[in-house]
Amino acid sequence: MPLNKDIKKVLVIGSGPIVIGQAAEFDYSGTQACEGVKEEGVEVVLINSNPATIMTDKEVADKVYLEPLTVEFVEKVIAKERPDSLLAGMGGQTGLNLAVELYDKGILKKCGVNVIGTSIESIKEGEDRELFRNVMSRINEPVIQSEIVTDIENGKAFANKIGYPVIVRPAYTLGGTGGGIAESEEELDEILALGLQVSSIGQVLLEKSVKGWKEIEYEVMRDSRGNCVTVCNMENIDPVGIHTGDSIVVAPSQTLSDKEYQMLRSASINIINSIGIKGGCNVQFALNPNSFEYAVIEINPRVSRSSALASKATGYPIAKVAAKIALGYTLDEIKNAVTQKTYACFEPSLDYVVVKIPKWPFDKFQGADRVLGTKMMATGEIMAIGSNFEAAFLKGIRSLEIGKYSLEHKKFREFSMEELKTRVISPDDERIFALAEMLRRDYRMDKVAEITGIDKFFIKKFRWIVEEEQRLILSKIDDLDKEWLYKLKKKGFSDKGIADMLNISPEDIYKLRNIWGINPVYKMVDTCGGEFEALSPYYYSTYDVYDEVEVSKNKKVIVIGSGPIRIGQGIEFDYASVHCVKALKKLGIETIIVNNNPETVSTDFDVSDKLYFEPLTEEDVLNIVEKEKPNGIILQFGGQTAIKLAKFLKEKNIPILGTTAGQIDMAEDREKFDELLEKLQISRPKGKGIWSVEDGLEETKKLGFPVLVRPSYVLGGQGMEITHDEKELVYYLSNAFQKNKKNPILIDKYLMGREIEVDAISDGEDVLIPGIMEHLERAGVHSGDSITMYPTQNVSKDIKEKILEYTKKLALGIGIKGMINIQFIEFEGNLYVIEVNPRASRTVPYISKVSKVPIVDIATRVMLGEKLNDLGYRVGVYKEPELISVKVPVFSTQKLPRVEVCLGPEMKSTGEVLGVGKTLEEALYKGFIGANMSIKKEKGTILATINDHDKEEFLPIAKKLHSIGYKFIATSKTAELLKEEGIEVKQVRKLKEESPNIIDTIKNDEVDLVINTPTKGNDSKRDGFHIRRAAIERNLGVITSLDTLKAIVNIKSKEIKDETLHIFDLSN
């Protein structure tokens, strides 16, 4: 069936901000889908609130609306654009839920919009737990014994009937939000209350636990004629009980017999035929390891995290094919873009092994509960490809950037066998290293398999790796012969991993490899196991005989990607990498990307001329450089991951385009940077590195409180704190020195001023600032967690001129060629520099979109020697637009048990949304709604607990809230303060006092919003921490910054209404 000619204009709903459970994979699938629809001559209208995406670029869709993803705003877009069709399955759970809501409210029918692809009825059968169970029962597909409940009493009754443990799965939620495994009635009470609250339809599935069964996934495509193909089957190494997003996954499955494989494949096809899927669908099974018994866990009737992985693992562009199916094509009419010979009805075959390992944020959150369960906690993932499981797995380990190049983790040497058992029975992010230590101590393999639920096949593979590691530890370099080294390299061991165990340098192994001619070759991912010639140059390394890479003599540049999504280094850097590649291609330069993230646009097969899916380590990057011999390598767009390679590449005499390793060091080394500032006569807050608590107290006497204290050599504000008095300072310093005595602690005078930020481009002579950004929260809140406003609202002309002057001095002083990011503080009329990053920053996509300056394109051309004055955007500060745009951070702290919520110098947000308006209030209103902050709630009850430093500032805000009609609940001191000002307040007992106390008011739903300004940010033993956590876990708004609160109150008093707001197409 060819293209449906009735489809002229399609609305695509994006997935919104990056949160745990919904990350960059939807930028990748959304971009692919939009391009797939556009190339058929159909107009694409996009709504998505996330400015950090390629998907929201004006080249991807015909009309781009960066607006909140709510029914009200989508309806506005529909009314303005009049699309005839809606493509619902490309925006993750957010897009799906919105499509169902638009349908149920009759908006689609009223506006004459047809849902193309999978129908709303089919989506409901896949998403609504009860409807899904009914379909499974009708087609005789087994499901786990379960009950749908809408209240706690019925839930408890069912659990008592089937026995504990039980699994709680809320309907229409993301990444297992609100779910969990309840081992007792007390745990069930808590999980069920939350699950019912977060489910958009107040419905939860309770099911008997099959914890320990194998978890198997099938990625299936189906067209409107009922043709089906299974694109990929994947096996979770971790058993059922750990969310698939937190599991290590291998493709194709390694331990299924042919009978099991065919049985589950037939079941997958049976299920998607019965539900009537048109497009892609992910089916998850639980398989009893001791029999042929299986049960269907759930399906995702849309593209998903797993479909992004399946796409990258096979080279089959699932999202693009799904979009074509939605337009009316059948699988036998859609050409395979990789081979250009076969069609989408050919099932991919793999002659290699793919491993996905999640990337968790626990380096940022030391106090977090790391135990993995049914609720996803990973922020991102890496993918590795090898010719055998061991090679793919070890590549995966070193891709995680956790400093591990083998399965040895020194801290587990100190653990007793009982402690190790605990770490694998209640598995956390480090369970593989604990398991390896057990095998190192000769713990029986069958016992390890029994207590972990991991198949003996994988345990054997881990055992082989551990045995080789032990042999290396007991050997010297002279024992390493050519055959042994070749065998180790073939199985994925890195030079550094081998060298560490032999106690020599990686350079020694590198030299030996070169003497013996042991170098990697590169194989192609071609979707067809080499059966047809592939046109997509998409490669992985292996130690083999035949090399499939054709090296050209063209002018070429390698772009280093940014690796897995994590807090502090998100999708913004992938955006920058992709735009760099596009700029190079326009200039006729061959582009090569090296990256290892399966979720991103940069690793799509047709973005660059060549893609190497490899770890971003020194050895793996050097192998590619030696193979390709590029004219240069670009590190500026890959975040800290890429920048870290600068020194090594310089030592190897590899030409780095743009800013050099020495210049990077000048910006990042505190002493060199201070010398430069002194020479340029630029101020920074006074400060010093100290080595003891006594030194710290002495230094603070000179500086005066408050001071900002932080460890040296950290990223993303890790471990920073603002202290206001001696007691707080002593507490922080003694803890910090206990953790690390090797490096100094930096103490700076904390200036409570206005924070201002610029991304600038320098060509070595001139500087262009596309836009000066102002932070809403005063300095002290990490720039990634601040609300950012552009154009600035409170910055004088004089200060702007000084910003340009300082930016030019710094860029030329360091010698920047390309991008530079500078953060300033304006305090009492003076301007201070607080940080300089000699690379692209996380604000690049935001400022590119709202200033309309193609920053990455210009920076790339400047790196290649062009001059700013010749590129048409002039120099200096670019002209400001009329519209105001705010970037509002989005947090995933609800997903991470025992993690601090309050804003501070350490970054915690996972994503961002954009709010665009004619006034600041309009822009902020949209930003808050897009970030799901409770801005719309009409009058309610506020629980206020205010730190002594903030009480004076809080009073006028409280009066305003009171005058709007809010009621207050507070503990004794805050309550007294409010009463003195004539504000009615209900006093509650403190946490340590008897019930009913402050936590009970939160648990009993007596509160709508919590305002809590913290005392000691990082101390999880304090009341404030428990208050904030209790509120977040109940889906309540928590505000810890008075600046944010002021902005909200200001908007509330203006009484902005959705219906009066304009929407803006940013593609013009």
UniProtKB/Swiss-Prot annotation:
| Cofactor note text | Binds 4 Mg(2+) or Mn(2+) ions per subunit.
Give the residues the record marks as binding Mn(2+) 4. Answer: 835, 837
Q: What is its EC number?
A: 6.3.4.16, 6.3.5.5
The record ties this protein, via InterPro entries, to: ATP-grasp, ATP_grasp_subdomain_1, CarbamoylP_synth_lsu, CarbamoylP_synth_lsu_oligo, CarbamoylP_synth_lsu_oligo_sf, CbamoylP_synth_lsu-like_ATP-bd, CbamoylP_synth_lsu_CPSase_dom, MGS-like_dom
Query: A single Gene Ontology molecular function, please?
Result: ATP binding
Limits of the MGS-like domain? 933-1068
UniProt keyword annotations, A-Z = Amino-acid biosynthesis, Arginine biosynthesis, ATP-binding, Ligase, Magnesium, Manganese, Metal-binding, Nucleotide-binding, Pyrimidine biosynthesis, Repeat
Return one Gene Ontology term, BP aspect: L-arginine biosynthetic process
Reactions accelerated catalytically: hydrogencarbonate + L-glutamine + 2 ATP + H2O = carbamoyl phosphate + L-glutamate + 2 ADP + phosphate + 2 H(+)
Q: Which residues bind ATP 2?
A: 710, 749, 751, 755, 780-783, 823, 835
Where is region (Allosteric domain) located?
A: 933-1068
* Annotated Mg(2+) 2 binding sites: 298, 300
Protein's recorded name: Carbamoyl phosphate synthase large chain
